Design a protein with these regions (language model features):
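Short metal-coordination and nucleic-acid-contact micro-motifs, chiefly zinc-binding Cys/His arrays
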Residues: 2, 36-39
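Short cysteine-rich clusters marking metal-coordination/redox-active sites
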Residues: 3-4, 43
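Cys/His-rich microdomains that often coordinate metals
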Residues: 8-10, 49-50
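Short, non-ligating residues that shape and space the ligands of small metal-coordination modules
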Residues: 12-15, 52-53
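Short Cys/His-rich Zn2+-coordinating modules
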Residues: 21-30
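Short loop/turn motifs at secondary-structure junctions and domain boundaries
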Residues: 32-34
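Short, compact, well-ordered microdomains
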Residues: 41-72
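Amphipathic alpha-helical segments in structured regions that serve as interaction surfaces
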Residues: 78-93, 99-138
Length: 138
């Protein structure tokens, strides 16, 4: 394999599947969410996370990749845990958001947790998530 190209790609690559980059990204599947048709990959060279999803069009579905930048020391499992906490808080307020917005909120909360010296445990994340969602008036 040649040097990976993760840093040369934009944050969103529309119309491309991760398999189109075989030999250019040393990807490894780390999670698959069948109800959402979303797969999470990690580049084994540079440790960049990629989310592959499909957007419905009038003539089928178009794949797209989204680069996920995690806060320092965070794992994909931490992100998933934080998304669950954020979704639980929003569900308790009868607020529904899509997966991308939930992920964005979770990444914001994780960034705050890291900046304040916290970790990514469920209790800490829940505390920061409640505070952050109040600040942004959700």
């Amino acid at each position: 394999m040649k040097q990976c190209i993760c840093n040369q790609l934009t944050d969103i690559v529309e119309g491309e599947s991760i398999k189109n980059f075989q030999g250019k990204i040393a990807y490894k599947e780390i999670a698959f969410y069948p109800t959402l048709w979303v797969t999470l990959y990690k580049c084994e060279c540079c440790h960049t996370f990629w989310k592959e999803a499909y957007k419905a069009t009038g003539h089928g579905e178009v794949p797209f990749l989204t680069k996920i930048t995690l806060p320092p020391y965070a794992t994909a499992e931490d992100l998933q845990k934080c998304m669950v906490v954020v979704r639980e808080i929003l569900d308790s307020k009868a607020i529904t958001i899509n997966e991308e917005h939930c992920q964005a909120l979770a990444l914001e909360v994780m960034g705050i947790s890291y900046a304040k010296g916290g970790d990514y445990s469920s209790e800490i994340i829940k505390s920061f998530a409640k505070g952050y969602l109040k600040i942004v008036e959700i």
